Amino acid sequence: MCGIVAIFNVKEQTPELRTKALGMSKKIRHRGPDWSGIHCSGSAILAHERLSIVDPESGGQPLFSPDGKQVLAVNGEIYNHKKIRERYKGRYDFQTGSDCEVILALYREKGVNFLEDLNGIFAFALYDEEQDAFLIARDHIGVIPLYIGYNADGKVFVASELKALEGECERYEPFLPGHYYWSKDPGMKRWYKRDWMEYDNVKDNTASSDAIRMSLCAAVKRQMMSDVPYGVLLSGGLDSSVISAITESYAERRIETDSRSRAWWPRLHSFAVGLKGAPDLAKARLVADHIGTVHHEINYTIQEGLDALRDVIYFIETYDITTVRASVPMYLLARVIKSMGIKMVLSGEGADEIFGGYLYFHKAPSAEEFHKETVRKLSKLHLYDCLRANKSLSAWGVEGRVPFLDKEFLDVAMRTNPKAKMCSVLPASRSGEADPKASIEKRIVREAFEDMLPEEVAWRQKEQFSDGVGYSWIDTLKKITSEAVTDEQMAHAEERFPINTPLCKEEYYYRSIFEEHFPSESAARSVPHEASVACSTAVALEWDEAWKNMNDPSGRAVSGVHENALQGDAVKSVNDIKDKA
């Protein structure tokens, strides 16, 4: 994972402005500790902090077109770059082996109308000195973070993390996923549009577990491209287990040579983190033994987690409760991963949003509401799980890739008939009894990959990551923050925090730390803020009258469902849900 900084509409190139850009870039050097680069020309400055994954010898940035008239700083991975390079064979003189250089070739031919050609994760700033124009863009879901800032003098700032912009520009905001900004026609323009965003376009579609399997396997294989050692995050839940199993099935051959040669690092390493005795750890070990990875189990103590909290909030740049809770163990894990020489990991983010995997989806009143909620969840993912996974890992110079959010796979999964994803329908088995597997969340994914996993994992009920690493972690956070924040402080919370006023003491505590790092109004507004139960959107609170006065993002907040899962009694869980329906 790299880091970028750019300043556009520069009226005069001065040593002071170059020094300023270097200082901004230095604040995000943790994202790219391998090399630093900067280019100043015309009305632009582009700086880059590199984490070398593909073409480590010659892929330094910024990147230049053959005539030097276009310059590019990009944080990302373009998974279909080889196919694009083949299209331009003999027509474009590539200067490096970097996967991201295809952006320049596409821009030279198509102008700004090329973003749909890319399958990857990216955030980039491109300066065209010939036209004195710039283009900024972000990937379809917002896997890669990006912020844009403005000054009254007309300067436009871009950075991978808000810490580079804090105090350097008058206002800034998250750059919207699936959008671009072209200086010749200013303003955010949406480039990523899909028919599946509307329920009417998918309600009569078919559903195929075979299609899910084939498409996800292809996505994982694409995303394994790497010239450095890589691994997988294996929590022991369904999503990470599926990604790990698929990755292991391809790990012996080098993807970059179309599997014609052996992999440079043929043994796949898997990583799990949690408190001792955490639910995730035993299941992760079971999966690792089953698929044959070299497994590493990282234990942390509650005190170690608490000690890291302030640093974690600085790196992840949020005070959202769910994100902070889950980021601490991931941040601690990333440090160990980096110490072992691993620079890239694949993980399972996105599956719960696509397939309705959170426990509250059991309450979806219809297929239409179910589908609309998945679309809402995906539209907000850049503010939650994508942010957590990216920034927790990049704090230690580790890149995270998320095959469930692959652009091609997303189309297959989101065009699947929503009725096949729902977990509230209970078809009878041949014996006439209710089939417990029929009502569990993400059933179509489980059916697609059950032959690759131990049965007790393939059909294990959902645990949120922060719950699964150890329940006492969440309980301690609630207790500590409740004791640290007084009732009087909460009574006057709106006076201290008029923007996104904290809804509970835990949020107040995190917000106070966040404000120490990032005191601006722009920073406060950059964080999402809405009532939630078990990671729901605010809209989904209408599904259950009891949820309207609750605000607990833990999966345990969904009454009756999670307690049964803890007992390991899937049949009882299904029957309880059936009784309540």
Map each language-model feature to its residues.
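Adenosyl-5′-phosphate
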Residues: 1-4, 339-346, 365-366, 370-581
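Cysteine-centered catalytic environments shared across enzyme families
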Residues: 1-319
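Hydrophobic (often cysteine-bearing) scaffold residues that line and stabilize catalytic clefts
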Residues: 17, 96-99, 118, 205-212, ...
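Short, hydrophobic alpha-helix immediately C-terminal to the catalytic nucleophile
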Residues: 104-105, 241-248, 331-335, 356, ...
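ATP-dependent adenylate-handling ligase core
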Residues: 209, 273-334, 360-369, 388-399, ...
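Glycine-rich beta-strand-to-loop/alpha-helix junction loops that act as flexible
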Residues: 236-237, 347-350, 469
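Short acidic/histidine-rich active-site segments
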Residues: 342-352, 358
